[in-house]
């Protein structure tokens, strides 16, 4: 199975349909009202209704389980990505499969990340690693040291986020070998508005890198 692709920050139907046609596996709809990429549940529902293929993901930041479940039901999200500092008991009460984001600090150590994974593993389907930034919860456009997470990606299904683009995705896949990659700001012309030109350039690089990685894994002893 090849590396999967999630694109976050969807606010427009045209962008969602273009990404579906390009081969995205997941589309992320930000449910954090303070974000420039906020897509209210009703708007997300309208877009999801007209897009087939990618799984729609609601992206939440420090919401309670009841709020998350209500938005999931209203919008029709298939997964919930919890991108804040949600406690494990909230994660375990979410009614759909969960992607739990872990924010990687510049001084993080692999054992610290593993401890966080173990704290949440009973209540989640996937993990997502993103670069820590004290001023924002995501869409930083900054990458972290991917080597920190290589062993975690062998043990857990991990989405890799933070600063990925057409120029570095091949190196990211080779270094970490994640389950999926997650992009947002690097595919935009403005916050919440995707650039088809950037999408095309990334897809060319991503598909070539994913195919090369899959071939290498096939020939591994």
From Swiss-Prot:
GO molecular function, one term: phosphoribosylanthranilate isomerase activity
CDD domains per UniProt: PRAI
Catalytic activity: N-(5-phospho-beta-D-ribosyl)anthranilate = 1-(2-carboxyphenylamino)-1-deoxy-D-ribulose 5-phosphate
Provenance organism: Salinibacter ruber (strain DSM 13855 / M31)
Keywords of the record: Amino-acid biosynthesis, Aromatic amino acid biosynthesis, Isomerase, Tryptophan biosynthesis
Protein's name in the database: N-(5'-phosphoribosyl)anthranilate isomerase
Gene: trpF
Amino-acid biosynthesis as UniProt keyword: yes
Pathway assigned to this chain's UniProt record: Amino-acid biosynthesis; L-tryptophan biosynthesis; L-tryptophan from chorismate: step 3/5
């Amino acid at each position: 199975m090849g590396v999967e692709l999630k694109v976050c920050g969807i606010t427009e139907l045209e962008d969602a349909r273009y990404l579906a046609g390009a081969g995205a596996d997941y589309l992320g709809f930000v449910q954090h009202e303070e974000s420039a990429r906020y897509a209210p549940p009703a708007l997300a529902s309208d877009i999801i209704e007209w897009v087939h293929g990618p799984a729609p993901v609601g992206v939440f930041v420090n919401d309670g389980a009841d709020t998350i479940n209500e938005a999931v039901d209203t919008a029709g999200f298939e997964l919930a990505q919890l991108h804040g500092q949600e406690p494990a008991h909230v994660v375990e009460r979410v009614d759909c499969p969960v992607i739990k984001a872990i924010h990687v600090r510049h001084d993080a150590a692999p054992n610290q990340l593993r401890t966080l994974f173990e704290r949440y593993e009973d209540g989640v389907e996937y993990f997502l690693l993103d670069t820590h930034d004290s001023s924002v919860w995501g869409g930083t456009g900054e990458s972290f040291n991917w080597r920190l997470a290589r062993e975690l990606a062998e043990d857990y299904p991990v989405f890799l986020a933070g600063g990925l683009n057409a120029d570095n995705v091949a190196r990211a896949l080779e270094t970490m070998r994640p389950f999926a990659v997650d992009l947002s700001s690097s595919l935009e012309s403005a916050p919440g508005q995707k650039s088809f030109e950037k999408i095309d350039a990334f897809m060319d690089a991503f598909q070539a890198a994913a195919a090369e990685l899959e071939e290498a894994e096939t020939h591994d002893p």
